[in-house]
């Protein structure tokens, strides 16, 4: 009987706290994640960026989307992106899932988060602010029927989370507006630690 009373009291506390704190808005949570990502600063490892590829895009929202990776010089690959939206988008979310290359395939790695794209660009998460340095992209919002280009972008390794293990990684980045998938990208890179630290 005592166990039942304790259980009933515990469930009452949970029900009361659920009513007092309604379910958070996913877009607000995405903004919180991009705020957390701005706190990342590391010099523990080096990031060898390889490429970004476009998997698919939704032609109801995008009239054009091209992603091209090329060598800026002998050692630095960079990405050029060209797009034209078919509708005005004030902001949308990115769902990022990491995969690590083991046993001759990319396997699920326990790193997954969702963030606001405009918030990530504004706070320069992973160096995204440099998208506005080359081309005619000036930031959010994303406007309808405006051909936009961002060029010579590469990730900033100092703005990544610390203590990620060495290895080859793939990030699958799914862009979502409300309940619709806009496009999916895959980014490939390697993480390594230098033998000699400076």
What are these regions (language model features)?
Residues 154-156:
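Generic short beta-strand segments
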Residues 2-131, 135-136, 141-142, 146-150, ...:
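N-terminal onset of structured domains
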């Amino acid at each position: 009987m005592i166990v039942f009373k304790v259980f009933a009291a515990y469930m009452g506390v949970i029900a009361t706290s659920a009513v007092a704190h309604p379910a958070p808005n996913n877009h607000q949570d995405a903004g919180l994640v991009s705020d957390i990502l701005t706190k990342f600063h590391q010099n523990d490892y080096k990031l060898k960026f390889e490429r970004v590829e476009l998997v698919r895009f939704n032609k109801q929202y995008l009239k054009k989307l091209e992603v091209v990776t090329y060598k800026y010089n002998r050692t630095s690959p960079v990405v050029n992106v060209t797009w034209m939206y078919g509708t005005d988008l004030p902001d949308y979310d990115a769902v990022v899932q990491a995969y690590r290359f083991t046993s001759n395939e990319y396997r699920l790695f326990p790193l997954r988060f969702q963030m606001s794209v405009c918030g990530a660009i504004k706070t320069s998460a992973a160096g995204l602010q440099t998208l506005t340095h080359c081309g005619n992209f000036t930031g959010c919002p994303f406007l309808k029927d405006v051909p936009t280009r961002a060029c010579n972008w590469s990730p900033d390794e100092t703005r990544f989370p610390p203590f990620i293990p060495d290895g080859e990684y793939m990030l699958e980045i799914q862009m979502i507006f409300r309940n619709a998938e806009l496009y999916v990208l895959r980014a490939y890179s390697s993480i390594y630690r230098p033998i000699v630290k400076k």
